[in-house]
């Protein structure tokens, strides 16, 4: 589900302070977790606490602004459309919920919670872009993850993930819908990998 949070946009007309119907409306979009089919088979829980932390995101994507490209080479921001929060932070929160809901760990939290953990998942956002160079356009999302044994400081596994989804419309609203689908598919893949890697290291 896509949610847009419109912000009031006030335009003074001739100094009288009247609102006009042609005034641009600023919108904020929320990246949702569009989940795949739920796993119904019983699963064994690992007696380990998993902590999540964000990696360093490059400056272009370390923003609440929505990035797009028209030619596949240049990059720009939408003028009147933003994410409700920075995508790196939002995706990390969605990954936390996903992994907690998997029921495979004793507990799942972010490192900022101050919880003592056994494993740490570092998640870095590499790309989140609306590519409108072809029709239909697509949204690509890519992340790199490191799974670390926090007690021994040993790198257990590293993997990059990338997913894309077509945009239903050639605008920021369509980009937001596609981003939610792509992020959901990426979290499907990421969750399975984390569980498998953590189980193998147990």
Language-model regions: role of each:
Residues 55-57, 71-73, 126-128, 144-150, ...:
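Solvent-exposed coil/turn segments that connect beta secondary-structure elements
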Residues 17-87, 197-202:
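A structural "domain/chain start" motif
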Residues 2-18:
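N-terminal export signals
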Residues 49-54, 67, 120-125, 140-146, ...:
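Soluble periplasmic/extracytoplasmic beta-strand elements of cell-envelope proteins
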Residues 73-82, 151-189:
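Short secondary-structure boundary motifs at beta->alpha junctions and helix caps
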Residues 20-30, 34-39, 102-152:
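Surface-exposed short loop/turn segments
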Residues 88, 92, 96, 180-183, ...:
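Extracytoplasmic/secreted envelope proteins and their assembly/folding machinery
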Residues 96, 100-104, 191-195, 199:
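Sec-exported extracytoplasmic/periplasmic mature domains
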């Amino acid at each position: 589900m896509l949610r847009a949070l419109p912000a009031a946009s006030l335009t003074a007309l001739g100094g009288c302070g009247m609102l006009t119907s042609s005034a641009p409306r600023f919108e904020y979009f929320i990246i949702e977790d569009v989940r795949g089919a739920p796993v119904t088979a019983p699963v064994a829980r690992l007696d380990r606490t998993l902590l999540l932390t964000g990696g360093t995101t490059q400056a272009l994507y370390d923003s609440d602004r929505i990035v797009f490209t028209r030619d596949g080479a240049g990059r720009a921001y939408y003028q009147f459309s933003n994410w409700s929060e920075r995508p790196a932070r939002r995706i990390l929160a969605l990954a936390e919920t996903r992994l907690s809901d998997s029921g495979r760990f004793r507990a799942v939290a972010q490192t900022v919670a101050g919880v003592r953990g056994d494993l740490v998942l570092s998640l870095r956002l590499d790309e989140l872009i609306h590519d409108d160079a072809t029709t239909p356009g697509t949204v690509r999302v890519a992340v790199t993850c490191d799974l670390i044994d926090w007690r021994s400081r040993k790198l257990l596994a590293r993997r990059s993930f990338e997913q894309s989804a077509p945009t239903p419309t050639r605008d920021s609203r369509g980009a937001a819908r596609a981003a939610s689908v792509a992020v959901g598919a990426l979290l499907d893949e990421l969750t399975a990998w984390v569980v498998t890697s953590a189980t193998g290291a147990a």
